[in-house]
Curated annotation (Swiss-Prot):
GO terms under cellular component: cytosol
Native source species: Oryza sativa subsp. indica
Gene: RAB16C
Keywords: Stress response
Name under which the protein is recorded: Dehydrin Rab16C
Induction: By abscisic acid (ABA) and water stress.
Length: 164
C-alpha cells in the first residue's frame, strides 16, 4: 500500500492533473518510473507489472475555469427595440460599436447623449432630426406623440435664448 501515498480509494475515483478520471493503472507491486503516482508527462504512457497499457490522452480542458483577457469593454449584447423591450444585437452592430469613427446614425447619437448627459441605461438618441430652429413647441423630453427623445444638440438649442 505504500505505492498509493495518501491517495483515497483505488481506481476510478482518481483524476489526472486536468480533472479526467484515470483508470486503475497499478499492476502488482512494481510501477514504471514515475514515482508511483500514475501520471506522467503529456502523451506519456504508464505500464504496470500486470501488463496493462493505458495511454494518457492529450486533451486540453480548463476544468470549468473561464479564462478572460485583461481588456474590458462596455458593449452590451442587447439594445432597445423602440417598443419598450430589448432585442439582441447582431454581430454587425457589435463590430460597428467598437470601431472608432465608424459610428454613424443612431449609435453615434446614442453614445453622445449617454456620455454627455448621464442618461439612464438603454436611453436612445434620436436620429433624423435636421434643421435648426424649426421647433414644435414641445419643451418636455419627447417630440410630439412619436415617443422619441430629444438629441443632445436639441437640448442645447432649447437652452439658448431667442430660439423659442
Amino acid at each position: 500500500m505504500e505505492n498509493y501515498q495518501g491517495q483515497h480509494g483505488y481506481g476510478a475515483d482518481r483524476v489526472d492533473v486536468y480533472g479526467n478520471p484515470v483508470a486503475g493503472q497499478y499492476g502488482g507491486g512494481a510501477t514504471a518510473p514515475g514515482g508511483g503516482h500514475g501520471v506522467m508527462g503529456m502523451g506519456g504512457h504508464h505500464a504496470g507489472a500486470g501488463g496493462q497499457f493505458q495511454p494518457v490522452k492529450e486533451e486540453h480542458k480548463t476544468g470549468g475555469i473561464l479564462h478572460r483577457s485583461g481588456s474590458s469593454s462596455s458593449s452590451s449584447s442587447s439594445e432597445d427595440d423602440g417598443m419598450g423591450g430589448r432585442r439582441k444585437k447582431g454581430i454587425k452592430e457589435k463590430i460597428k460599436e467598437k470601431l472608432p469613427g465608424g459610428n454613424k446614425g443612431n449609435n453615434h447619437q446614442q453614445q453622445q447623449m449617454m456620455g454627455n448627459t448621464g442618461g439612464a441605461y438603454g436611453q436612445q438618441g434620436h436620429a433624423g432630426m435636421t434643421g435648426a430652429g424649426t421647433g414644435t413647441g414641445v419643451h418636455g423630453a419627447e417630440y410630439g406623440n412619436t415617443g422619441e427623445k430629444k438629441g443632445f444638440m436639441d437640448k442645447i438649442k432649447e437652452k439658448l435664448p431667442g430660439q423659442h
